A protein has these predicted regions:
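GST-like fold's C-terminal all-alpha helical module
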Residues: 1-59, 63-67, 72-135
Length: 135
């Protein structure tokens, strides 16, 4: 979580929303998850300590307003691409793929290696359905 906050802090420092000066579907999709972390004492403490721009974004999203345009990808990529690569490419997609394979195989539980550590859990149907929609 601290790593995600750090990457998001680097991206939101100096911009109002994920893609520039107006909220996007991405902001609304991510906001709910981060808001819930902010109001929980443990992840909220990490967020307040390491992510003042992220906290400001969460608060801004309570009453979002467009104040300008979306930025070009060239301006966004240096800080947004590392966040997306790390959180989605390195962690979420490998987990999601292992989950889907476990469901197809009828497995009670499955293991997936993430960041050199083994994660074990029961497969969940909703995430497999979501993966199928984007795959």
């Amino acid at each position: 979580w601290a790593e995600a906050v750090g990457l998001l802090e680097a991206h939101l420092s100096g911009r109002d929303y994920l893609f520039g000066a107006r909220p996007s579907f991405g902001d609304f999709g991510l906001w709910g998850q981060v808001y819930n972390c902010l109001v929980d004492p443990t992840p909220g403490g990490i967020l307040r300590e390491k992510g003042p721009s992220v906290v400001a974004w969460v608060e801004r999203m309570l009453d979002p307003k467009a104040s300008g345009d979306f930025e070009a990808w060239e301006a966004l990529a240096p800080t947004l691409a590392p966040f997306v690569q790390r959180m989605c490419g390195d962690l979420f997609l490998p987990w999601s793929e292992a989950n889907a394979k476990a469901l197809v195989g009828g497995d009670e539980t499955y293991d997936v290696e993430l960041d050199g550590r083994t994660w074990t859990q029961k497969p969940v149907k909703y995430q497999a359905k979501s993966l199928a929609a984007i795959w």
